[in-house]
A protein has these predicted regions:
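N-terminal glycine-rich anion-binding loop in soluble enzyme alpha/beta folds
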Residues: 2-79
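N-terminal glycine-rich phosphate/adenylate-binding segment common to multiple enzyme folds
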Residues: 70-102
Length: 102
């Protein structure tokens, strides 16, 4: 079965929003994390705050050693979130690793 699709080019000039939301949060989450993105979505007003996420590798089980392995990965992961753009906050979605790393 064939379909004919008729399209007309738009005459409305296209432009991207410079910054569609007032505040930006860069969230680094663990690859195994099931909740951080949903938690941020529930507490942040999407018309005012954008949450932009990147994940880092993480191997279960949770031990001091596996938590320490996340440290060297954080800078590169955060840098990949909206590269060349300013963010207002960088959050790391792992309290246990934050404590172990200091």
């Amino acid at each position: 079965m064939a379909f004919d699709i008729h399209a007309t080019p738009s005459r409305v000039p296209a432009r991207l929003d410079h910054r569609p939301v007032k505040k930006r949060i860069a969230l680094v989450a663990l690859a195994t994390d099931h909740t951080s993105e949903r938690d941020f979505a529930r507490i942040c007003d999407p018309d005012r705050v954008g949450v932009y996420v990147n994940r880092i590798a993480y191997e279960n089980p949770t031990t001091r050693e596996t938590l320490l392995k996340t440290g060297p990965r954080l800078t590169a992961a955060a840098a990949q979130i909206l590269p060349e753009e300013a963010v207002d906050v960088v959050a790391y979605g792992c309290t246990a690793a934050s404590i172990v790393l200091g």
